[in-house]
UniProtKB/Swiss-Prot annotation:
Family: Belongs to the eIF-3 subunit A family.
Described function: RNA-binding component of the eukaryotic translation initiation factor 3 (eIF-3) complex, which is involved in protein synthesis of a specialized repertoire of mRNAs and, together with other initiation factors, stimulates binding of mRNA and methionyl-tRNAi to the 40S ribosome. The eIF-3 complex specifically targets and initiates translation of a subset of mRNAs involved in cell proliferation.
GO MF terms held by the record: mRNA binding; translation initiation factor activity
Protein name: Eukaryotic translation initiation factor 3 subunit A
Keyword RNA-binding assigned: yes
PROSITE patterns with a match to the protein in the record: PCI
UniProt entry tagged with the keyword RNA-binding: yes
Alphabetically ordered keywords of this record: Coiled coil, Cytoplasm, Initiation factor, Protein biosynthesis, RNA-binding
Length: 955
């Protein structure tokens, strides 16, 4: 991965060249992309970025990375948006030029491959594989080569156009280059016949226009570079683009898309303040005529030709060639003659819509178009055969002579191939007029006679069955009222005539009787019944009086009618504007819905393509694994697998085949080894039986050979050792002369090294002593600083301790005062309790005395023999069960009944606490009361005798 973070824009090109040189084109492209997308690039000058972006575009095209280049162009547009947005134009042109050049190169390569395949072997016959491929596929070798070589670059070029249009859209400063790219995209679709891409391109342009013209809360924010459709030049550019779109749609024969383009052009024409160019409008009407002709709408087809002729007739004299004028005039008259008689009875809403597209005030009719053409003296400009056809059909039409008159005319028209689309509708018109005229003359005729009259030379020829079918269809549509009697072989004409507007040959007898009175009135009105001058004078005076009386009324009616006409016209105009606005809204909504549907469809297609891509990748991986495994198996030589016939096999099957083959070969090898071992065993046994007699002789010979070899090797070793020893002795003698010089040089070196060592050791000892002294000084200074810091801390601790002791003493004094106060309160309560006990004792003594007296009285009564008091008499409280018992008598065993039943006891005499108040300092177990810190055990001040100890000094 290339380093992206710290690369400056000025060094990017150099780094890119280095990466490309080592074959890392993808890393180089990523480096360029991140350079353009980095935040630092926004502050870089455009002149510095231009070569980087140019290299980025070139490398993206080479690697065919459409998505990366689209994002890069968007980032570059953001950079140059505020400074010089036109700087993006050369980048766009370079991008499209490179992409188009790649397509051209791919086409040349495909042609070269096709030529090589064709010229590979001129005498070779077709192989069975070629025959099978030709059978199952309709493509030839050239088509397959194009799909493999050219199609990927075509797809890349199409994506390039889409990406560029997305970058350039809705920017007023880029309108010109936007229009140029659209024209290039149109030429691309036309050159390569890309009909699907052309439809998508048209939808893309409509969505761009819709976004530009959108208003309301959902509209994009208006900026300084937003496109303004109210500008005449901008609208003219959009009109030019739509005219080009219409031309390409017609050339590609995409009639539905062409009609939608016509609607786009008409919508822009309605909002344009500048009239369109006559040449463009002429092209518009001619394309519209072709669309209507393909759709079979001959009425509006003729109306479009009529508008084109009207446009040409307004051109300056000599501006239009005579041949072109004659061609258009001939098409105008011929298309008007080919209009069926019932064409005006079609859908009214559709006719209104098509009328608006032709900029007509009212729905055209056949008669109106013919009158309009004749009013411009069109017969003087049309071809002679068309003029003769008009006179035959509209002026001199007669059912009995029509065949003879049309034969030479039809032959002349049939020679012109451009008139071929009008043969069928003209024949329908001729038959309709023929049967209408026959119905005015005859009540019944022979069927053979009718078929003879309706049979014309080619291209107007028809079979009798086709003629009968035409009659049936015309009757079903209400054009004719005819019955065919096949038994009598006759044709019966009804009396009802279709209101076709065609001229009548003569009136029927019924018509003569019905119109007799009206004809008589018209005849009498022509005759002058008043012959005298007096009568004529009276008539004149009466007429003058009537005229004077009616003049004012007629004038008022005229004004009222004019006002009503103006009101209706204004209402119609308002309704038309409202209708157009509603249609525009519906059209915009429809475009939005279609755009959403298209986005959903594209997303679904993208998802499907992604799934298909994943599936293909998985299949490719499996195929690669199968192929690799098959190659490994073939390399091992276990079995031989044809790499071209791996269909239906997977890796498990290949491994199973390998294992089965190994098992089979192992079994076969074992069988062969057993047979071979048995055979070798017998052979070896026979060999050894034969070798026994030869072994002793061979042993003696072997000993002799070994001795000879041993003696030879010993002699060689001795000779070699002696030669080496002599060479070393000679070398020692030669080196002995250099020993004194060696010793002298060694001693000199040793003396120098010892002196250097002594010097370095002394320097090291000196440096060590200096470092030691510095270290000692540093330690002393540190210890002094530590002592000062410890002294300051001790002083601070002493101050804190003194402060804490003072606080503890004050707290102890407060606690002592609290204890004294509590003791005083206790003493007061005890004295009060003592007084209460004394009062109680005195009361008890009184009660005892009273009780004694009562006892004495009772004893006296009983001794005197008086009756005892009733059982319900008075009993003192002390003797009642559950009665009151003084506190002093409660609790002992000999207490009176009711003792211990809950009588009152002073809190100070209660046992176990009894609920009496006990000071917190005397409570056992803490009791939850307050205990001074000096008396707490295990507290933070334990062992300090109540003195406060700071937390830092506690153990």
């Amino acid at each position: 991965m290339a380093p992206h973070q710290n690369v400056r824009p000025e060094t990017v090109l150099k780094r890119t060249d280095e990466l490309i040189a080592v074959g890392q084109q993808d890393a180089a492209l990523e480096l360029l992309h991140e350079t353009v997308s980095a935040r630092k690039a926004r502050t870089t000058s455009v002149a510095t970025l231009e070569p980087i972006v140019a290299r980025f575009v070139q490398l993206s095209v080479d690697l065919r990375k459409g998505k990366i280049i689209k994002d890069g162009l968007h980032q570059y547009k953001k950079i140059v948006q505020s400074t010089n947005v036109n700087a993006i134009e050369p980048v766009i042109k370079q991008f499209l030029s490179l992409a188009e050049q790649r397509v051209t190169d791919a086409q040349a390569q495909a042609d070269k491959i096709a030529d090589e395949e064709e010229a590979d072997d001129l005498e070779a016959e077709e192989t069975p594989e070629d025959l099978l491929l030709a059978t199952v596929s309709s493509e030839d070798t050239k088509d397959r080569t194009d799909r493999r070589v050219v199609t990927p670059w075509l797809k890349f070029l199409w994506e390039a156009y889409r990406s560029v249009l997305d970058v350039l859209r809705n920017n007023s400063k880029l309108e010109v280059i936007y229009q140029q790219v659209v024209e290039q995209a149109f030429n691309f679709c036309l050159k390569f016949s890309r009909k699907t891409e052309f439809r998508r391109l048209c939808e893309l342009l409509r969505s761009h226009l819709q976004t530009t013209a959108q208003k309301g809360p959902n509209a994009p924010p208006v900026t300084a570079t937003s496109v303004d459709l109210s500008d005449a030049d901008t609208l003219q550019r959009y009109l030019d683009t739509r005219f080009s779109q219409l031309n390409v749609a017609v050339k590609l024969e995409l009639w539905q898309e062409a009609f939608r383009s016509v609607e786009d052009v008409h919508t822009l024409l309605t909002v344009s303040k500048r009239p369109a160019k006559p040449l463009m409008m002429g092209n518009y009407y001619e394309n519209l005529a072709r669309i209507f002709l393909v759709a079979g709408n001959y009425l509006f087809h003729a109306a479009a030709w009529n508008k084109l002729f009207h446009l040409l007739s307004q051109s300056p004299r000599g501006a239009i060639p005579v041949s072109e004028y004659q061609r258009v005039a001939s098409f105008v008259l011929l298309s008007a003659l080919a209009i069926p008689h019932n064409s005006s009875a079609e859908d009214r809403y559709r006719n209104t819509r098509l009328t608006g597209l032709l900029n007509l005030q009212r729905t055209p009719t056949r008669d109106a178009l013919l009158k309009s053409a004749l009013s411009r003296n069109i017969l003087a400009h049309v071809k002679p055969e068309i003029k003769a056809l008009y006179k035959t059909l509209e002026v001199d039409f007669h059912p009995l002579s029509i065949r003879a008159k049309l034969t030479p005319v039809v032959g002349a028209i049939a020679e012109a191939p451009e008139f071929k689309p009008y043969f069928a509708p003209l024949y329908q018109v001729i038959l309709t007029r023929l049967f209408q005229q026959l119905s005015q003359v005859y009540e019944s005729v022979k069927l053979d006679f009718v078929i003879q009259l309706a049979t014309f030379p080619a291209p107007f020829s028809a079979t009798p069955l086709e003629i009968e079918q035409f009659i049936v269809r015309a009757c079903a549509q209400g054009e004719l009222a005819i019955k065919i009697d096949h038994d009598q072989r006759s044709v019966l004409f009804e009396e009802v005539r279709a209101a076709t507007g065609s001229a009548s040959l003569q009136d029927t007898p019924i018509e003569i009787v019905r119109t007799q009175l009206s004809r008589l009135g018209r005849t009498l009105s022509v005759a002058d019944p008043l012959n005298s001058a007096e009568a004529r004078e009276q008539q004149y005076v009466a007429a003058l009086t009537t005229a004077q009386d009616n003049a004012e009324r007629e004038h008022a009616e005229t004004l009222a009618r004019r006002a009503e006409i103006e009101a209706r016209k204004a209402q119609a105009e308002a309704e038309r504007a409202q209708r157009e606005e509603e249609e525009a809204r519906k059209r915009a909504q429809r475009l939005l819905d279609e755009e959403l549907a298209e986005k959903e469809r594209l997303a679904a297609e993208q998802h499907a393509r992604e799934l298909e891509r994943i599936r293909k990748e998985q299949d490719a991986i499996r195929e690669e694994e199968k192929k690799k495994l098959a190659e490994e198996i073939n390399a091992k030589g276990i079995i031989t697998i044809d790499l071209d016939k791996l269909e239906g096999l997977d890796t498990n099957a290949l491994r199973k085949m390998q294992v089965d083959q190994l098992a089979k070969e192992t079994k076969e090898l074992g069988d062969r080894l057993r047979v071979t071992a048995r055979r070798i065993d017998h052979t070896e046994r026979a060999y050894r039986m034969e070798e026994i007699k030869l072994v002793e002789d061979d042993f003696v010979k072997q000993k002799q050979r070994d001795r000879e070899i041993y003696d030879t090797r010993i002699k060689l070793i001795k000779d070699t050792a002696k030669a080496e020893h002599d060479a070393k002795v000679e070398l020692a003698k030669r080196l002995q002369r250099a020993v004194p010089f060696y010793k002298s040089f060694r001693d000199d070196i040793r003396v120098k090294r010892e002196a250097e060592f002594t010097r370095l050791r002394e320097e090291a000892v000196k440096n060590l002593a200096e470092a030691k002294a510095a270290r000692i000084e540093e330690v002393k200074a540190k210890r002094i600083a530590d002592a000062k810091r410890a002294e300051e801390e001790a002083k601070a601790a002493a101050e804190a301790e003194a402060k804490a002791a003072a606080e503890a003493e004050a707290k102890a004094k407060a606690e002592q005062e609290m204890r004294e106060k509590l003791l005083a309160e206790k003493k007061a309560r005890e004295e009060a309790n003592a007084r209460a006990d004394a009062a109680y004792e005195k009361q008890r003594q009184k009660e005892a005395e009273l009780e004694a007296k009562l006892e004495a009285k009772r004893a006296g009564f009983s001794g005197a023999g008086r009756q005892a008091p009733p059982s319900g008499g008075y009993v003192p409280p002390s003797r009642r069960e559950g009665g009151y018992v003084p506190p002093s008598r409660r609790g002992d065993a000999g207490a009176a009944p009711g003792a211990g039943s809950g009588g009152y006891t002073p809190p100070s005499r209660r046992e176990g606490g009894g609920g009496g108040y006990v000071p917190p300092s005397r409570r056992e177990g803490g009791g939850g009361g307050y205990v001074p810190p000096s008396r707490r055990e295990g507290g933070s001040g334990a062992g300090s005798g109540g003195r406060y100890i700071p937390p830092s000094q506690r153990n």
